[in-house]
Amino acid sequence: MNIAIAGASGRMGRMLIEQVLNTEGVSLAGALDVPGSPALGQDAGLLLGRQTGVAISSDVEAVLAGADCLIDFTRPEGTLAHVAAAKKLGVKMVIGTTGFDEAGKAALAEAARSIGIVFAANFSVGVNATFKLLEVAARLLSTGYDIEVIEAHHRFKVDAPSGTALKMGEVIADALGRDLKTCAVYAREGHTGERNPNSIGFATVRGGDIVGDHTVMFAGIGERIEISHKSSSRQSYADGAVRAARFLADKPNGLFDMQDVLGLK
């Protein structure tokens, strides 16, 4: 399988390139970056100390021309432009970008009628196992427990709460038969009154180089259960993303998530 990487000069992009180079059965077909990036024209492996023979380019269609799949962990506006080009050229996509609004998510669903797309809040196998644990815990602790989601990321993350935190909230809300749009509480300040027992709270921390910490607290009277996942590097995300690309090899179209890739549905 020939894989192209978007955001090739970024932290996640470099790790994805390295993962592709180290994975049997796949090859690096292209490396994409934004116009004006100082990395344009450089070998995609330069920052890894390796030569790939693939130059970083800002020409989306040229990069996709030799690719079977594009892996994209960038920003919503860039990803949506890449989706349009991928749909035109019949190139599949693995999307780890977070922060989409409802219109953006609808655009991904529409594109998935024509091409295979894996769109997930988190590509870590451990995080996806955590989603299943939360589903079970929410059903067992459906009454008498207050639910709070606490997440922490590095200072450069631009969206909050994280896509993973929101997915955790969705998993819990679905297990409880609730709608996260109506039961989520994203901020508390001043005189808030008593906590609504049916709400799901979110707290966000941003600082330093935290890769990603997520904890869900089920707080009852006399006890508290906490389910946590902490990432020490982005390696698990890169591994999962390449695994997702290979999953798409025989999928002509459709919208999938990491639970599909791992056979957890």
UniProtKB/Swiss-Prot annotation:
Keywords: Amino-acid biosynthesis, Cytoplasm, Diaminopimelate biosynthesis, Lysine biosynthesis, NAD, NADP, Oxidoreductase. Pathway: Amino-acid biosynthesis; L-lysine biosynthesis via DAP pathway; (S)-tetrahydrodipicolinate from L-aspartate: step 4/4. (S)-2,3,4,5-tetrahydrodipicolinate binds at residues 154, 163-164. GO terms for molecular function: 4-hydroxy-tetrahydrodipicolinate reductase; NAD binding; NADP binding; oxidoreductase activity, acting on CH or CH2 groups, NAD or NADP as acceptor. It catalyses: (S)-2,3,4,5-tetrahydrodipicolinate + NAD(+) + H2O = (2S,4S)-4-hydroxy-2,3,4,5-tetrahydrodipicolinate + NADH + H(+); (S)-2,3,4,5-tetrahydrodipicolinate + NADP(+) + H2O = (2S,4S)-4-hydroxy-2,3,4,5-tetrahydrodipicolinate + NADPH + H(+). One of its GO terms (biological process) is diaminopimelate biosynthetic process. It is found in: Cytoplasm. Its main location: cytoplasm. NAD(+) binds at residues 7-12, 33, 96-98, 120-123. GO terms for cellular component: cytosol. The active site is at residues 153, 157. SUPFAM superfamilies: Glyceraldehyde-3-phosphate dehydrogenase-like, C-terminal domain, NAD(P)-binding Rossmann-fold domains. InterPro entries: DapB_C, DapB_N, DapB_N_CS, DHDPR_bac, NAD(P)-bd_dom_sf. Its EC number is 1.17.1.8. Transmembrane segments: none annotated. Belongs to the DapB family. PANTHER family: 4-HYDROXY-TETRAHYDRODIPICOLINATE REDUCTASE 1, CHLOROPLASTIC-RELATED, DIHYDRODIPICOLINATE REDUCTASE. Catalyzes the conversion of 4-hydroxy-tetrahydrodipicolinate (HTPA) to tetrahydrodipicolinate. This is 4-hydroxy-tetrahydrodipicolinate reductase. The gene is dapB.
